[in-house]
Amino acid sequence: MFHHISVMLNETIDYLNVKENGVYIDCTLGGAGHALYLLNQLNDDGRLIAIDQDQTAIDNAKEVLKDHLHRVTFVHSNFRELTQILKDLNIEKVDGIYYDLGVSSPQLDIPERGFSYHHDATLDMRMDQTQELTAYEIVNNWSYEALVKIFYRYGEEKFSKQIARRIEAHREQQPITTTLELVDIIKEGIPAKARRKGGHPAKRVFQALRIAVNDELSAFEDSIEQAIELVKVDGRISVITFHSLEDRLCKQVFQEYEKGPEVPRGLPVIPEAYTPKLKRVNRKPITATEEDLDDNNRARSAKLRVAEILK
């Protein structure tokens, strides 16, 4: 059974300015905390489209949302398919979309999913259990150069080369099959002094592998750009991120659409084509409250950004 504490639950939904008869999309259903809070504000004409690529999360959410099932459409899919999902449902535009990015607590807490560096499990890390690529495949078969690239780019790991070398040396002897086996190898690649600083030594490599397995950053970029086109004027998009890579990407996309195209010189009136598509509701990201942190230590790195559609 999933037990998941939603981060910044009220803020994420309240910033959407919920209309009681509106249509909303939850792109990351997870433990359904945000979904339940939103559904409690909708009347019988309101509707929620709830997306998750993890079928276990959807099965659990049906129980959590059992009093609201007549207003929820569950979709087992990657949120990068937003446009197609709405097309299949014959919906043109919605009133708001929200994302709660990162791994949900239950995925971390179920050892056999392979996300956690605290429990021994096979190297899996797939959000969608039907996809083929796993962490095992990356760790054992990707080249040294590819490993260095993902550890550095997705994990911001400064010892990427040393760790990739240790992985290479170990897998030449025999395949690396479990999470704790990988943790020990990562520790070998990090100098003893550095291992004692900055949290768990495997944290950054595990984050990098998870992002690579699930193609998280490019999926999010695809999705958020579609979301901007699928929300009605005055509708809003809320995004909670959990690490700097996601937050930077979200900020850059919102900034780009807020600027609009460059206006040619000498135009007496600025045509609508050159006006911004959206405005950022909060210039600086909203962070978790002390109350959030008391409930859920994973909220410490959470940042919320909100944009409102202008045209």
From Swiss-Prot:
Q: Give the keywords, sorted.
A: Cytoplasm, Methyltransferase, rRNA processing, S-adenosyl-L-methionine, Transferase
Keyword Cell inner membrane among record annotations: no
Report the SS bond pairs.
none
Recorded catalytic activity of this chain's protein = cytidine(1402) in 16S rRNA + S-adenosyl-L-methionine = N(4)-methylcytidine(1402) in 16S rRNA + S-adenosyl-L-homocysteine + H(+)
Q: Where in the cell is it found?
A: Cytoplasm
Q: Does the keyword GTP-binding apply?
A: no
The record's listing under InterPro entries reads: RsmH, SAM-dep_MeTrfase_MraW_recog, SAM-dependent_MTases_sf
EC number(s) on record?
2.1.1.199
Residues bound to S-adenosyl-L-methionine? 32-34, 52, 79, 100, 107
Cite a single GO MF annotation: rRNA (cytosine-N4-)-methyltransferase activity
Single biological process term from Gene Ontology = rRNA base methylation
Major place of residence: cytoplasm
- GO cellular component term, pick one: cytoplasm
Lineage: superkingdom: Bacteria
Under Gene3D superfamilies, the record lists: Putative methyltransferase TM0872, insert domain, Vaccinia Virus protein VP39
Q: What does this protein do?
A: Specifically methylates the N4 position of cytidine in position 1402 (C1402) of 16S rRNA.
The Swiss-Prot or TrEMBL record describes its family as follows: Belongs to the methyltransferase superfamily. RsmH family.
Its protein name is Ribosomal RNA small subunit methyltransferase H
